[in-house]
Amino acid sequence: MANPEIVISSCSSHEEENRCNFNQHTSPSEELLLEDQMRRKLKFFFMNPCEKFWARGRKPWKLAIQILKIAMVTIQLVLFGLSNQMVVAFKEENTVAFKHLFLKGYIDRMDDTYAVYTQSDVYDQIIFAVNQYLQLYNVSVGNHAYENKGTDQSAMAICQHFYKRGNIYPGNDTFDIDPEIETDCFFVEPDEPFHIGTPAENKLNLTLDFHRLLTVELQFKLKAINLQTVRHQELPDCYDFTLTITFDNKAHSGRIKISLDNDISIRECKDWHVSGSIQKNTHNMMIFDAFVILTCLVSLILCIRSVISGLQLQQEFVNFFLLHYKKDVSVSDQMEFVNGWYIMIIISDILTIIGSILKMEIQAKSLTSYDVCSILLGTSTMLVWLGVIRYLGFFAKYNLLILTLQAALPNVIRFCCCAAMIYLGYCFCGWIVLGPYHNKFRSLNMVSECLFSLINGDDMFATFAKMQQKSYLVWLFSRIYLYSFISLFIYMILSLFIALITDTYETIKHYQQDGFPETELRTFISECKDLPNSGKFRLEDDPPVSLFCCCKK
């Protein structure tokens, strides 16, 4: 942009009175001085930390805090991740143990196929589960126990859900049914003796009308303590397992599916004593977490202050430009004052502070929100590491990735919106048509995962081969469906997506060689030829520059 002419106009309205008074009482030399001051202020604002140090001796505190925070947050996440891994492993191993303990003849990886097909097998499974529950202390190798309710132990609830009335005669193609569902429950106490006999003489006195039966549920509660955390210098947690064994006969197809669901809750143990230095280690970890919170608070304050300073300078520049050149600053130029990296760091700091507080509460056994804490700490750590890219971006050779992503993002979003319409169309079509015949298309979520893996070229043959050939028309449709999807997304849409990124990359490389297009803001700043170490950016109360804090580029 060439040097803009200073426009002096008459006062035509009350709202321009201040501007007119300024233009009428300000000499050209004073206006040039104000322009130079504004240029220096803007140039200083857009300098990198090293240049700001040479310009005013300002220490790069935010950079130092970010480097310190990366190390501390990463260490914190690793330590919590190891602890959370033990919790998840304990949950999964107990669930597998319960399936082997209470499901007769259960074998690993039978969750989708575990079922019974005769009435006697149903009774046998129920009796086996009840007997295993009553003999828990004699058969379980874990530290499992019944839930205590005062002086009594919790009972197992056996409930059957069935239609209120049902007379079904498939041979005559007739039926009479009342779809209202009724529930009948009774309880088995752990201290009661139990006799295993034939279905006709078993102690349960359970009779099932399989024509009306929908489900049979066996629900009971067990407790356990995760002692493996002691070896890692952590206090153990107490676990409550709410187990539900379901016999599903809703389809009335002759196949009753059996499943075991385990609802797990973690809580603080009531009375405990551990010898050794576990409590001391817990206190040290809480001190470390408190130091992480303090560091993030400092980072949060510094970044918020920088964002506010940017917004204030933005408003000052907009008013200055409107006052001197009677022009509005473009939105793109105004957005350059809003530093997205600082906003990302602010979000990261907030997540880290909340996650660290939760972690301290978990260590103090006041909370057991492991999953929420892991999500907060994991997301914050990811954002912290991404925030470092800002400082790498000050070097031209490392800035190519950032510039390419920034330039390509608008086009990528528009392209993905169009591609998503096609993708969702294929998802719904595959779910409805192929779902009954293909395991990978049974739910909308599974369809999306299957199609996305096909785009990456994964598991193509298995997807074709697992299609059932019970219906030739559907089998033929599946071939047309899969071939068209693969051809469209891999050879066309994915290629166009890569070409979009590649074209942006080449454009950025060309700009780096020949110069980037100048905006009004950058052109205005470029007229300031003062170097950072010229001394013209320094304020009266600035301390002298020390050569030991930063190296001149």
UniProtKB/Swiss-Prot annotation:
Main localization of the protein described in the UniProt heading? membrane
Q: How does the record classify its membrane topology?
A: Multi-pass membrane protein
Impact upon substituting residue 524 to A: Decreases channel activation by phosphatidylinositol 3,5-bisphosphate
- What are the annotated disulfide bridges? 159-185, 238-269
State how changing residue 138 to Q affects the protein, per the record. Loss of a predicted N-glycosylation site. No effect on function
Q: Where are glycans found on this sequence?
A: 138, 205
Q: Which InterPro entries match?
A: MCLN_ECD, MCOLN3_ELD, Mucolipin, PKD1_2_channel
Q: What regulation of activity is recorded for this protein?
A: Channel activity is activated by PtdIns(3,5)P2 (phosphatidylinositol 3,5-bisphosphate). Inhibited by lumenal H(+) and Na(+). The channel pore shows dynamic behavior and undergoes spontaneous, Ca(2+)-dependent modulation when conducting Ca(2+).
Please tell me one Gene Ontology term that the record gives under cellular component.
membrane
Q: Where is motif Selectivity filter found?
A: 456-459
Q: Which reaction does it catalyse?
A: Ca(2+)(in) = Ca(2+)(out); Mg(2+)(in) = Mg(2+)(out); K(+)(in) = K(+)(out); Na(+)(in) = Na(+)(out)
Region annotated Extracellular/lumenal pore loop sits at 104-118
Region feature (Interaction with phosphoinositides): 52-62
UniProt-listed Gene3D superfamilies: 1.10.287.70
Pfam families, per database record? MCLN_ECD, PKD_channel
Q: What does this protein do?
A: Nonselective cation channel probably playing a role in the regulation of membrane trafficking events. Acts as a Ca(2+)-permeable cation channel with inwardly rectifying activity. Mediates release of Ca(2+) from endosomes to the cytoplasm, contributes to endosomal acidification and is involved in the regulation of membrane trafficking and fusion in the endosomal pathway. Also permeable to Mg(2+), Na(+) and K(+). Does not seem to act as mechanosensory transduction channel in inner ear sensory hair cells.
Q: Which family does it belong to?
A: Belongs to the transient receptor (TC 1.A.4) family. Polycystin subfamily. MCOLN3 sub-subfamily.
How this chain assembles, per its entry, is: Homotetramer. Can heterooligomerize with MCOLN1; heteromeric assemblies have different channel properties as compared to the respective homooligomers and may be tissue-specific. May heterooligomerize with TRPV5 to form a functional distinct ion channel. Interacts with GABARAPL2.
Supply the domain comment. Answer: The most N-terminal extracellular/lumenal domain (referred to as I-II linker or polycystin-mucolipin domain) contributes to a structure with a four-fold rotational symmetry in a tetrameric assembly; the structure contains a central highly electronegative pore with a 14 A diameter. The pore is critical for Ca(2+) and pH regulation. The protruding structure formed by the I-II linkers may contain all the interaction sites with lipids and proteins in the endolysosomal lumen.
Which named protein is this? Answer: Mucolipin-3
The source organism is: Callithrix jacchus (White-tufted-ear marmoset)
